[in-house]
Design a protein with these regions (language model features):
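Flexible "stalk/tail and boundary" regions
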Residues: 1-24, 28-29, 37-106, 114-170
């Protein structure tokens, strides 16, 4: 409670979840220890998560309930999937490159070997960048993250230039 004016009022504080960048290591068995901040974000939604390989070459980690909401929004009926190459391909990609995982008591998740290879993590211990994406986190190699960050900055600059040109030349 805070004293505001002449009354006590309860202040609602919105905490940003899954925001920021962190760095961690993955051991030779594929175990990743989450930072206390991201671990708190995940455990506030339960310890069940879904790992999902992204086309950009990273591994996303979502709370299970978040992943299920994402999938429901892109739901494909069984009939549509059976009669559609694109429908089957979408299900194949989601099915093959997603896996349930549970955060251990030590605050770790384990990446399957195929997911490590997809994201460019070699064998043995690896450094990784953990990027908050507001609905979960993404695990990147430092090299791939730097390239992705550069692409985003170039895109933002190009978009700004287009907006300025449109504004200056109506």
């Amino acid at each position: 409670m805070d004293y505001i004016g002449n009354k006590w009022k309860k202040q609602v504080v919105w905490m940003l979840t899954f925001c920021g960048i962190d760095y961690c290591s993955m051991d030779s068995n594929g175990r990743v220890k989450l930072s206390p901040k991201f671990l708190e974000d995940f455990t506030s939604k339960g310890i069940d998560v879904v790992l999902h390989c992204l086309p950009e070459g990273a591994v996303a980690v979502y709370p299970e309930e978040t992943y299920l909401k994402i999938r429901q929004e892109r739901e494909i009926t069984e009939n549509r999937a059976a009669g559609s190459f694109l429908g089957r391909q979408m299900l194949r990609r989601s099915g093959a490159w997603s896996q349930s995982e549970r955060i251990s008591a030590q605050g770790r998740i384990t990446l399957p070997q195929a997911f490590r290879e997809h994201a460019g993590f070699g064998s043995g211990s690896q450094k990784m960048v953990v990027v908050g994406v507001e609905i979960g986190v993404e695990l990147w190699t430092p090299e791939r993250w730097n390239a992705e960050r550069q692409r985003m900055e170039e895109h933002d600059l190009e978009k700004r230039n287009q907006e300025m040109q449109a504004d200056l030349n109506p």
